[in-house]
Design a protein with these regions (language model features):
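Flexible gly/pro-rich beta->alpha loop and the following alpha-helix that scaffold active-site loops
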Residues: 1-50
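Residue-level detector of flexible, active-site-proximal loop/helix-junction positions
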Residues: 2-4, 59, 101, 127
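General beta-strand structural signal in soluble alpha/beta enzymes
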Residues: 21, 53-55, 121-123
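Short, active-site-adjacent cap segments at secondary-structure transitions
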Residues: 27, 59-62, 128-130
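Class I SAM-dependent methyltransferase SAM-binding "motif I" and its flanking Rossmann-like core
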Residues: 31-32, 38-100
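A general structural signal for short secondary-structure boundary/capping elements
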Residues: 65-67, 138-141
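Conserved anion/nucleotide-ligand pocket segment
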Residues: 85-132
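Short acidic-glycine loop/turn motifs at beta-strand connectors
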Residues: 130-136, 140
Length: 141
C-alpha cells in the first residue's frame, strides 16, 4: 500500500531530474498512484518538461487508460481502483513483453483483442518507445 504523502511525493519528484516508474501489477500501481495523489503530480511535472521513464507497468500507466492490460495482468489485485484512466502522457497504448515466456501470451491476447480499436505500440523486453514532443520512435535492441 502507498504510504507516501502527497507532499513527500511532490518534494521527491521536484528535486529529481527524472521520474522513473517501475513494473509490477499495472492496476495496483495505478491504484496507489491515485491514492497518494502522485498521478496528478507526475502529469504536472511531465507537462512542465520533466523526463518520465516507465518500465512495464510504469509504461502502461502512462497510457490514456489501462483497462486493455487486463489481458496480461490481474485487475483484482487493485480492489480500490474504480477508474482505469491512466496518466495520459501518451496517446497510444503500450504493449510490452512481446515474446516473453510468461507475459508474451498476454501481450498477444491484447494485440488480437484490441489491434483494430486501439493505437497499440508493441515492444519486446529489449526495446523501448521514445516520445519527444510529437515524435514517437521505437528504440531497437
Amino acid at each position: 500500500a502507498s504510504t507516501a504523502s502527497c507532499e513527500s511525493v511532490e518534494e521527491k519528484l521536484t528535486k529529481n531530474d527524472m521520474i522513473f516508474v517501475g513494473g509490477g501489477n499495472t492496476f495496483f500501481l495505478l491504484q496507489e498512484l491515485k491514492k497518494s495523489g502522485a498521478d496528478k503530480i507526475i502529469v504536472q511535472k511531465v507537462n512542465r518538461g520533466k523526463l518520465y521513464i516507465g518500465e512495464s507497468a510504469g509504461a502502461i500507466a502512462a497510457c490514456p487508460d489501462i483497462g486493455f492490460s487486463a489481458e496480461m495482468d490481474e485487475p483484482e489485485k487493485a480492489p480500490e481502483l474504480t477508474d482505469r484512466t491512466g496518466l495520459g502522457l501518451v496517446d497510444f497504448y503500450l504493449v510490452p513483453h512481446l515474446g516473453h515466456p510468461e507475459m508474451g501470451p498476454g501481450a498477444e491476447a491484447i494485440i488480437e483483442k484490441y489491434s483494430s480499436e486501439l493505437k497499440l505500440k508493441v515492444i519486446d523486453d529489449y526495446q523501448a518507445i521514445l516520445v519527444e514532443d510529437d515524435k514517437v520512435s521505437r528504440l531497437p535492441k
